[in-house]
A protein has these predicted regions:
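Cofactor-binding active-site loop characterized by glycine-rich and histidine/acidic residues
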Residues: 1-102, 126
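Conserved acidic/glycine
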Residues: 1, 5, 84-87, 107-109, ...
Length: 323
């Protein structure tokens, strides 16, 4: 997500001029994605705008809380799949609102995405009723707002309009809570009750409905590769192209492979772009003190000459870092 968004808004090319916004640049980006010597398949430290690794699930809320501490004007919109919602760290993360002061800190807007399926299993939360989910989240100090996209998923325009309406409602609620709290001091503030947006959306929405008689959209088979095509198995490439062309790329990109101006204009500008946000790129705010690791390197001539513990030696370097 971070790679595709930053490429489309131009920031990826600003950071990597060897990947221009044209057909050749797009091909190169696709080539190096999840490829040896290329870029990671999930968010990684080198991914522009990334604040955590995307492959291991469970830390989204905790990292979002860290991003808004002492940043009172920031809202961290945090998308959580219902599969990630079942992990231990994520369940504990719902309590991160305990540590947020509505005067000094920003807010988290969890967007809990209920699609009903993990890679091979159904999920628990999607099988709960809205009433059960409301009781659960209210008990944890959140105010649930529901967006049932699944019920109107065949009408894409109506679905997007509904989700936009619920997002506006959530942001307005956050601003209302903060405005009331900021009439007083941080010392007087109590734990805020921020909204959680619970969105029921089909897994693999807008993907293939089925493949060879087996349902795809709305089930676990929508995960990752819905149509079996690779460099050595091209017999179904026409079906793949038909699906991808359903998104009408010819209306989004010009003949050179660049996003058309009327679409590009919608994107935020400057450091409002996802990959250029100073909060996610702390190293650009001020130089980082990385200390001199050479001072702590062990000097030896033959293997086994020195007996040492790695954590103790690294601890000396870490102490130098924070000195």
């Amino acid at each position: 997500v971070m790679v595709s968004n930053s490429y489309l808004d131009g920031s990826y090319t600003e950071l990597n001029p060897n990947i221009p916004q044209n057909e050749e640049g797009f091909k190169h980006l696709c080539k190096i994605f999840s490829f040896p010597g290329g870029i990671a398949s999930h968010a990684a430290p080198e991914t522009p705008g990334s604040i955590h690794e995307g492959g291991e699930l469970g830390y989204a809320l905790s990292h979002a809380a860290g991003a808004v501490l002492d940043n009172p004007d920031v809202i961290a919109a945090t998308v959580i799949g219902d599969g990630e919602g079942e992990t231990g760290p994520l369940m504990a993360g719902w309590l991160s609102n305990t540590f947020l002061n509505p005067v000094n800190d920003g807010a988290i807007l969890p967007i809990f995405y209920l699609n009903g399926g993990k890679i091979h299993n159904p999920t628990i939360f999607e099988r709960k009723t809205d009433e059960e989910l409301a009781l659960f989240f209210e008990g944890l100090g959140w105010k649930p707002i529901f967006a049932n996209v699944t019920a109107i998923s065949e009408d894409h325009e109506a679905a997007h309009a509904l989700f936009a309406e619920k997002l506006d409602e959530a942001i307005e609620e956050i601003k209302k809570v903060q405005a009331e709290a900021r009439k007083g001091s941080a010392e007087e503030a109590t734990q805020p009750v921020y909204p959680v947006l619970i969105a029921r959306i089909p897994k693999g929405w807008t993907g293939p409905k089925a493949w060879e008689g087996t349902p795809i959209e709305g089930g676990f088979r929508a995960h990752q590769v819905p149509i079996p095509v690779d460099a050595h198995h091209m017999e179904h490439v026409d079906a793949l192209l038909s699906w991808l062309e359903s998104y009408r790329p010819a209306e989004l990109f010009d003949e050179t492979g660049k996003l058309v101006p009327e679409i590009a204009e919608i994107a935020p500008k400057g450091d409002r772009r996802m990959a250029m946000n100073p909060i996610t790129n702390a190293g650009v705010i001020k130089p980082m003190n990385t200390a001199d690791w050479k001072k702590h390197a062990l000097q030896f001539n033959t293997p086994g000459e020195i007996m040492a513990q790695d954590m103790i030696e690294f601890g000396k370097y870490a102490a130098d870092l924070v000195d």
